Amino acid sequence: MSSARRRALGFSFQALLLCAAGWHGAAQADGVSALRDFVQNVQSGRATFNQTVTSPDGAKKKTSTGSFEFLRPNRFRFDYTKPYEQQIVADGVKVWLHDVDLNQVTVRPFDQALGSTPAALLAGASIERDFTLANLPEEAGLQWVQALPKAREGSIRSLRVAFRGKDLAAFEITDAFGQRSRLDFNRFEGNAAVPAARFKFVAPAGADVLQQ
């Protein structure tokens, strides 16, 4: 797998998972309250997304699009459609990263996604235990929340989550190297009837399977 694709999959696996923690809930007085409500009350959901990754100097940007589904506890999938077809599927025990073009699959234990990472929110861990939350000023009609990981050894420098009214609107992560990745969400359905079968992954015939 090329370094560029590995980086794209790595971001998806680690950073996007915060989005799976919750999407749609009752209107809140502030973003922190909305985030807490999402984590506690949203059991499933689906949406489409646009992702933009910006280099530390701001000179280079990469864009991608796809769809997202989750079902608590610990099940989610991301399907990238452009520019490369990729899948990330978690069944509660393992996480499967599938590069369709290369027919290559990387498998990781699910517990590697836990701790002071966005995956902790997906798994239902305590927000205050793993993150320090703070409301940020409103920008362009969006209520922003900052979530700083309490563990300093991870690859995440900071997370920002945005709400528009009662809906999650955007998610932004800055990694340890200063690279910024943002996702904007569309057509979300909260507490949707997502079949459990959507989170069962079988490696395609002939795929190169790498265990990590």
Swiss-Prot record:
In its UniProt entry, the species of origin is given as Leptothrix cholodnii (strain ATCC 51168 / LMG 8142 / SP-6) (Leptothrix discophora (strain SP-6))
Q: Quick one: which gene encodes this?
A: lolA
Q: Which NCBIfam families match?
A: lolA
Q: What interactions and quaternary structure are annotated?
A: Monomer.
Q: Gene Ontology terms, cellular component aspect?
A: periplasmic space
Gene Ontology BP annotations: lipoprotein localization to outer membrane; lipoprotein transport
Protein name per Swiss-Prot or TrEMBL: Outer-membrane lipoprotein carrier protein
Main location (coarse class): periplasm
Question: Which keywords does the record carry?
Answer: Chaperone, Periplasm, Protein transport, Signal, Transport
Residues making up the signal peptide according to the UniProt record? 1-29
Family note = Belongs to the LolA family.
Check the record and name the PANTHER family matching this protein.
OUTER-MEMBRANE LIPOPROTEIN CARRIER PROTEIN (PTHR35869:SF1)
What function does this protein fulfil?
Participates in the translocation of lipoproteins from the inner membrane to the outer membrane. Only forms a complex with a lipoprotein if the residue after the N-terminal Cys is not an aspartate (The Asp acts as a targeting signal to indicate that the lipoprotein should stay in the inner membrane).
Database matches in HAMAP family: LolA (MF_00240)
Q: Where in the cell is it found?
A: Periplasm
